């Protein structure tokens, strides 16, 4: 099968196609698969362990990501994965609780863009030590200046 066809199936294919593609050697195929909002839990189980950070990065931004996969990705060693998770519109509160204290300012900056943020997280980011994070949270639609 041609690589281009595999990439298309990774995004739009049936479960049977995806079953075959989840362990494909081609990074682009797995990357496209990770962003598929119709991805089944069993496929996410495989992709959350992928050694390639680009695959985990794309999975972290998937709006259909299951809580248990967020549990894993919230502690990912790569900040880019955590940054994309921070932007996920369906991020669970407990993961916001973790990411709001992330040591990396860019993770917190990306969290400040998440329109699903709870008031307590907005308030905490409004007192962040980093100027970039402060400026970003002040542009949040639910931010109320003191």
Language-model segments: residues:
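Alpha-helical scaffold segments
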Residues: 1-146
